[in-house]
Amino acid sequence: MPNVVLSSRLTNNDSVFLQEWIKPSVRPYYLKNEKTKFWPEQRELVTDLLEHDIIESAFQTALNPAPQRFVRIVKFHRVNDYTVYATIRDSTALILCYFTVDCVLDYETINNDRITLNTLNTLFVIGNVTLQFWNHRECKLWFNQDFPGLRMVPVLKIEKARMFDRDQISSNVQFEWVYDTLHG
């Protein structure tokens, strides 16, 4: 009898909910803006989360998953006035982001924990995400990162975040920055 390999086993995902969405979402806006040399923010790159009870919301998301909503926090770069600057990833790519003051306060009130406490590699559901384009000086200041091949650096502004799975599963896979794939 021949071996059967399920399509879900062809890629090494650490969660069935964590799918590729960063590259396909960010790249078209970057390429369009690079041509026009105008860098407006893109609102609702990811739509808002439902305003239900946390358990109900997580359960609802599990039943009807939208792949663009799941991320893992890979690194915290800095915290300044309750704004948290971090690197997140989907199943294939890394991107810089920041969690707004309202997002952090909402998370910490609901979970009675700091957003930076034991959340590295934790699976989050995010919502109300805006794609912004930052200059190199801002990225160096807030993230201590530089991407010299880019004119502007895409950064995600996250206004809603809910912990979906508290397991801190790290991956042996080396993820690439979304910035390495943005050149035409």
UniProtKB/Swiss-Prot annotation:
Family stated for the protein in its record: Belongs to the EST3 family.
UniProt keywords, alphabetically: Chromosome, Nucleus, Telomere
Disulfide bonds: none
Name recorded for this polypeptide: Telomere replication protein EST3
GO biological process assignments: telomere maintenance via telomerase
Job of this protein: Component of the telomerase complex involved in telomere replication. Stimulates RNA/DNA heteroduplex unwinding which favors the telomere replication by the telomerase.
Species this protein is from: Kluyveromyces lactis (strain ATCC 8585 / CBS 2359 / DSM 70799 / NBRC 1267 / NRRL Y-1140 / WM37) (Yeast)
Subcellular location field: Nucleus; Chromosome, Telomere
Record-level GO cellular component terms: chromosome, telomeric region; telomerase holoenzyme complex
Signal peptide span: none
Subunit description: Component of the telomerase complex.
GO molecular function: telomeric DNA binding
Pfam families assigned: TPP1 (PF10341)
Record bears the keyword Transmembrane helix: no
